[in-house]
A protein has these predicted regions:
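Short acidic, glycine/proline-enriched helix-loop-strand junctions
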Residues: 103-122
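Conserved ATP-utilizing enzyme core subdomain
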Residues: 15-60
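Glycine-rich phosphate-binding/hydrolytic loop that grips phosphoryl groups
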Residues: 1-9, 13, 18, 121-141
Length: 141
């Protein structure tokens, strides 16, 4: 997230990315199912699901829209990778940890994708410290 944001927008902190994507609009960036199905040809499908990240990047897209597009793309990549890994092992519950889990837009992506793919994303309290706790406990194995 930081690398893409720094390269594309010159923004290099999660806090600034969070702030700038608050007023972003994915309609100016991502091609979604609703753009492909004007007549609602896919009943029961979430029409806000992304068909192509940055597939509808508009010349009117603002820095805010692009920041939200980056957050959305990174979140969807994490979510779909986790979903495929869970399915490979017959699991439906996916526990998420790390700093990104504290971002409201990241959480919103997981919330939106969970019912579509019939999984449960679990974000525990203090999830941002999960990777550090794992590293600290590793020597005790």
């Amino acid at each position: 997230l930081i690398g893409l944001s720094k390269k594309m927008l010159g923004i290099d902190t999660v806090e600034h990315i969070e702030q700038i994507c608050e007023s972003g609009n994915l309609d100016n960036v991502d091609l979604r199912v609703k753009d492909l199905s004007k007549n609602h040809k896919y009943p029961g499908m979430n029409e806000d699901i992304t068909a192509s990240n940055f597939g509808k990047l508009s010349d009117i897209a603002t820095k805010h829209d692009i920041a939200l597009g980056i957050v959305n793309m990174v979140s969807e990549t994490i979510a779909t990778t986790a979903i495929f890994a869970a399915r490979a092992h017959g699991l439906k519950n996916i526990v998420l940890t790390g700093n990104l889990t504290t971002m409201p837009h990241v959480r919103a992506v997981f919330t939106a994708l969970a019912p579509t793919f019939d999984v449960n994303f679990i974000i525990p309290a203090n999830s941002q410290f999960g990777t550090v706790i794992g590293a600290a406990l590793h020597p005790f194995k």
